[in-house]
Design a protein with these regions (language model features):
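Hydrophobic/basic alpha-helical segments
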Residues: 1-346
Length: 346
């Protein structure tokens, strides 16, 4: 890993000499020394675990899988044609090798929390999958949770919308009970931190979904605005949004996507987004060449919601002022003003 001298000594001092005891009824058990592991909840723990499991990529790569790791959560990805009948065996063999590797590293593959999601290329395609590992069977799930986002096999995100709406409604219910004791400003801060933040989390996945699918989330935002001002259920929300300087849900999603597009052009976006939004290069000199436009690919059937298709269109539809020569902070201010006028003042 290239860690030497003082840095290596610092890691060694962090990992060695640890012990623990259990308090019970005012007394503590005998102190036991830890030969492995560090204190649970340590800030450095996830990073050290990622370093410890670096060789996992060699195993997944040998079976043709890509993978992501987030602390102790590992996700494997495999793309295969519909007529491939060997993918079940490939998945089983890969999981079996991972289980053996974990045992050699004093780890354990938790099969009770292992989930399988198959996303077919077309809704009409059905896959009969049965994964066997360590005498246990693993069947495909209709939906799985990925860092708080519920992803279903059809990518409709209906389950995710229902989950977010449920958690937000519960938060609003609790705030409503203490609303008589809160000022308007305190209520606004509480709603923004416990409700609006949930609506904004990973909302880019909701791009171009049917209005009926995302309507529950918009209703949650409407209820949140009414709660801030302590207005009745039927109160009109547009004046409330204007006073709160809140963008409605559709505009918030568009704001998130366009800020990501700016970061892609600025080189500050995650690496995996860079190939999805490329600058438009004309075959001949044009006056529009200085407008900082993005290349719009021709989408295939069923791919109109792809980031690489919808974001360049949104970016090119912006006026030239936000797109050209603005810093990120200025771009966000101009973009919010533009969306505010488009969705609330017209």
């Amino acid at each position: 890993m290239g860690i030497t001298e003082k840095a290596c000594a610092w890691f060694e001092s962090y990992l060695t000499g640890r012990s623990f005891s259990v308090p019970w009824l005012g007394q503590s058990s005998t102190v036991h020394h830890l030969a492995t592991r560090v204190s649970q909840g340590s800030a450095l723990g996830p990073l050290l675990f990622a370093i410890y499991t670096t060789s996992l990529g060699e195993i997944t790569g040998s079976h043709g899988f890509s993978y992501h790791c987030y602390a102790d959560d590992t996700q494997l990805y495999l793309s295969f044609p519909p007529d491939d009948h060997t993918f079940s065996a490939r998945i089983s063999n890969c999981l079996s090798d991972i289980s053996k590797w974990m045992k050699s590293y004093n780890l354990q593959l938790n099969l009770s929390k292992t989930e399988l999601l198959v996303i077919p290329a077309k809704p009409s395609i059905q896959h009969n999958i049965s994964i066997q590992i360590d005498f246990l069977s693993l069947a495909p799930s209709k939906a799985v949770r990925n860092l708080g986002v519920v992803i279903d096999e059809r990518l409709t995100f209906k389950d995710h919308v229902a989950s977010v709406a449920c958690s937000c409604c519960f938060a609003l219910y609790n705030i409503r009970k203490i609303r008589p004791y809160l000022t308007q400003h305190a209520t606004q801060l509480l709603v923004q931190s416990t409700v609006i933040s949930h609506l904004d989390y990973c909302n880019a996945h909701l791009t171009d979904l049917p209005a009926c699918t995302v309507r529950p989330l918009q209703m949650v935002q409407n209820a949140a605005a009414r709660l801030v001002f302590n207005h009745p259920k039927g109160a009109h929300v547009t004046p409330l949004f204007i006073e709160l300087h809140w963008l409605p849900l559709a505009a918030r999603i568009k704001f998130k996507l366009l800020t990501l597009a700016y970061k892609v052009r600025d080189g500050t976006a995650p690496i995996y987004l860079n190939p999805l939004a490329k600058d438009y290069v004309s075959a001949r000199p044009l006056r529009s060449s200085q407008d900082c436009r993005l290349a719009v690919p021709t989408p295939r059937s069923g791919q109109s919601r792809l980031f690489s298709c919808i974001v360049p269109q949104m970016w090119n539809d912006l006026p030239s002022t936000p797109r050209i020569g603005a810093s990120f902070s200025i771009f966000k201010k101009l973009l919010k003003t533009l969306l505010f006028r488009e969705h609330l003042l017209n």
